[in-house]
Amino acid sequence: MLNPDGAEVFTRRNTLGIDINRDALDLASPEGRTLKSVRDSLEADFGFNLHDQSKYYNAERTDKPATLSYLAPAYNYEKDINEVRGNAMKVIVLMNELVQGFAPGQVGRYNDDFEPRAFGDNIQKWGTSTILIESGGFLNDAEKQEIRKLNYVSILAALYSIATKSYEKIDLAAYEKIPQNDRKLFDLKIEDVQYELLGNTYTLDIGVHYLEVDNASHSEYFTKAQIMDLGDLSTYYGYETMRAKGYKIIPGKIYTPKKGEQPTKEKAYSLLKKGYVYWLGPLAMGDNGFNFPMQVVSNKFVLPDFRLYVGLNPSFLLSKDGVISHAVVNGYLIDLQKESSAFRNAIFLR
């Protein structure tokens, strides 16, 4: 691991404040100097460059997440292909073929624009065939456990092809057939929903991301949803998509509990069906938020006039034919008829 200090607190930069992966030329960081020294001492024929990647990347023009993205980095601006880079491309073709059996359509080809300061690009230039593996998203795998397995079988396939030299028979053109990755995924996409503003009704799409917020020790997190885009999102996709034609957005109300009334999941579903989205009163919020499907508000909280905008933490109701059938609480879609959801947590609003 190149940056253990950054990994401890989920940040790209090291304790010095440097992005080590932009330090291949200056070698100002001790980590960068160590990596360069190891590469030069080994003069390895092949190298694997493992990265974490946002889960919002997809295989281009598909709704499939780019669970893994591969790249044989360019070593110059012209993106020339010499034997060193070509060998990396050939191995990637075999890796992709194997992974397709476990995650069909969920492999992308990372952008190969040359970055002269990056280690991957320079290690390729220094003579080691470099294979970048970016680990993106996989449905219902927030901790990337399934993606770890795909990394394992992917690297195993690569090592076998190197040991047997089977990669040498691969046609380079097959590398270009791997779809490029794109960044057009939302956690939740609501399509064609009706939204009333200033007396007029509009039909639009809503795209939501679940942003992770760490606790003080970085040992746990809660999610805070945010609207990332509004309007025509027909070229975007969602891990979860609701086709909401005929549904109307209904602003939620605040519920004031009776003395001694306890917040339960059953109570929350009942209140949501009646138009309440917010629970007034003190609740103990854990490190991973409130495991209670209503937003929790303080006595000082004033419910603003309802309006959608990019950056909003979305909480509202959805009705069809006058019946409230769904709720969106902290960006999580809840089917009130089935009382089912992938709900993770609500948040406290002051």
Where are each of the predicted segments found?
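Active-site/substrate-binding loop(s) of hydrolase catalytic cores
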Residues: M1-G105, Q124
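C-terminal accessory segments enriched in acidic
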Residues: L42, P73-K79, A88-R350
